[in-house]
Each structure stands twice: as C-alpha cells, then as structure tokens.
C-alpha cells in the first residue's frame, strides 16, 4: 500500500507533467513550438480551472490589488535607474521589435507566466512542501531553470521568481506582478547586451540565435 496521500501524489504528478511539457516546448524546434505552445497553454489552464477556485483565490480579482499597486512604481523606478546606469556604462540599446503588438503581447505573456508560476506550480508546491519558504524557493528555482541555457536570464529570473512568489503570498494579485515582470523584462532586454541574452530567448532558441 502506498504511503503517499492520493492528493499529494496528484499534485506531484501535475507538477512533473506540467513542467515537463513546458520544458519540452522550450526545447522544441520553432515550427513545433507553434503547435505545442497553445496546447500546453490550454492544458495547464484547464488543470487550474478544474480546481474551481474563485477569481480572488487565483489572484485575478480585486483582492490585494490596491495594496499591491506599489509594486508597479517600484518596478518603474528600478527600470529608470537601470536604464540610467546602462546608458552611463554604454550597454543601453534599442528594444528588439519595439512595436505596440510585440510589447503588448509580451506583457500578456508575463501575466500568464505569473499565472503558471503562482496558480499552477506554487499552489501545488505549497501542498507538497510543509515549509512555505522552501516552497517559495523551489518555485523560484523551477521558474529560473526554465530559462536555461540563458545564464544571465536564469540568474535574474531566480531572484524575481522567489520575490514574486513571496509577494503573491502576501497580496495574492497576478495583475501587478505580471505587469511588473513585463516592465522588468523589457528593462533587462534594453540594458543587458543582446550578445548575452539573445533577445531574451531560452532553450533551443537561445542556442540557435544568430
């Protein structure tokens, strides 16, 4: 007889399966990514929605929104400071594909990344790991490792992954965290040389960057 509680076994299975699918997409050729990405997006969304949590519980409602709004000006201030320093040391450069469609699409993507991190992975890790700090650290590590082999982005996302998980535990709002991540990601893209982060690409796309 198994000593693993059925619910814990399910959580572990969903973490492994979800992360495996995401990493598989990241390392797939670009033409295959276009097919697999929406499939994985829908599957992970359905798994979360199957839990029948309310919008506030998912972090998509009004709960914590006002109290967490300080995160956005903090992200803007950090962005401004980083751009000032980058300009002084000569690494500041134009954004790759700076049109509205790409920027807005990127911001939507960072909101969904926070949805995956908090509502899919963090929620299950909290049930699997009795220590909240350990769950936050583990979630941040999984988030960062998904950005390999982009080492500079992996280091940055390790910090942000842990910080954003801790902030979500306090405020439980995805909107401020997703938008803050988008701002910081765009800042990273223009302040760190493309030669290091390859237009923020990860997985196979990073290795095939020219």
Regions found by a protein language model. Name each.
Residues 30-39, 93-97, 151-158:
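Short, aromatic-rich membrane-interface segments at the entry and exit
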């Amino acid at each position: 007889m198994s000593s693993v509680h059925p619910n814990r076994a399910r959580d572990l299975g969903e973490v492994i399966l979800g992360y495996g699918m995401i990493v598989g997409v990241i390392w797939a050729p670009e033409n295959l990514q276009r097919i697999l990405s929406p499939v994985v997006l829908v599957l992970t969304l359905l798994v979360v929605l199957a839990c029948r949590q309310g919008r506030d519980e998912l972090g998509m409602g009004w709960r914590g929104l006002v109290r967490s709004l300080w995160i956005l000006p903090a992200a803007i201030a950090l962005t401004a400071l980083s751009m000032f320093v980058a300009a002084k040391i000569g690494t500041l450069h134009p954004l790759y594909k700076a049109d509205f469609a790409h920027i807005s699409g990127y911001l939507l993507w960072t909101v969904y990344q926070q949805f995956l991190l908090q509502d899919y992975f963090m929620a299950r890790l909290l049930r699997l790991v009795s220590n909240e700090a350990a769950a936050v650290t583990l979630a941040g590590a999984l988030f960062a490792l998904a950005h390999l082999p982009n080492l500079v982005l992996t280091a940055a996302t390790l910090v942000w992954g842990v910080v954003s998980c801790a902030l979500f535990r306090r405020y439980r709002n995805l909107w401020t965290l997703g938008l803050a991540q988008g701002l910081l990601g765009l800042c990273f893209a223009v302040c760190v040389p493309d030669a290091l982060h390859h237009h923020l690409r990860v997985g196979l796309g990073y290795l095939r960057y020219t």
